[in-house]
Amino acid sequence: MTQVESRFAGGGAEAGARLRTLADLVSDGGVLVLSGAGLSTESGIPDYRGETGRRRRAEPMTYQTFTGSAAARRRYWARSHLGWRHIAAARPNDGHRAVAELARRGLVTGIITQNVDGLQQAAGADGVVELHGALDRVVCLVCGDRTPRARLDERLRAANPGWDARAAAPGTVNPDGDAVLADADVEAFRVVDCERCGGVLKPDVIFFGENVPPGRVRDCFALTEAAGALLVLGSSLTVLSGYRFVRHAAGHGVQVAIVNRGATRGDEHARVTLDAPLGATLRALLAELDARG
């Protein structure tokens, strides 16, 4: 086992060979990264499905439910208000930092993230395409005004004095920023409206059942076609939103590499797959590239 392989959590000859194949692809440059929730798990933000591909939790909020029910919006904002501090406190991990370093070296020339946590940008990466939006922004569904989530947090605290202390009992906040609340706490929560027009506010993210803006999708397809390779990090590719870019890459002769915990929907299109921890794998990738000079 080489020195680089010994630092790779996957270890062993097969893992080392897969790592070297990954390094071959990345060293040629022009790499487009497509990242999913698995890249942020080491920052304390659980992914949706885990290694088995099965959803960990109950069905998330849908766009149709959110827009069609004031009660659903109150429940969403109460839980999200309590849990937002967890997302806001998360910090980039080794995987995020490795992607940013590959970009600084000019090997990664584009990043599409399915994540809404902003951690890849916090690690220093520029020009990240936020496929599903970002939790640190809020948008009005009537006038389209966008404001920082921190401003909404201030307004919700002012509208609900003492509510945080009453609701935030130990153990009520899940690691993903969602919060387990009693019905009475939800009923007591007051939602605020757009400061500009009084319209309904929504996090600036793509809910399940909501379409990604067509222009954003076109930009991602263009990035995929121009790439020398597509590197998928931490995504099971179960939903079409991300999988379509893998399929598009394969259809245009762009080589695909996938690093994820567990199998993915796109494995059949990949030149190489690694079922291994993201942080350790990407650290080992950097070490392999450094060893090559």
Task: Place the predicted regions along the sequence by residue.
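Conserved catalytic core of sirtuin-type NAD+-dependent deacylases
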Residues: 1-293
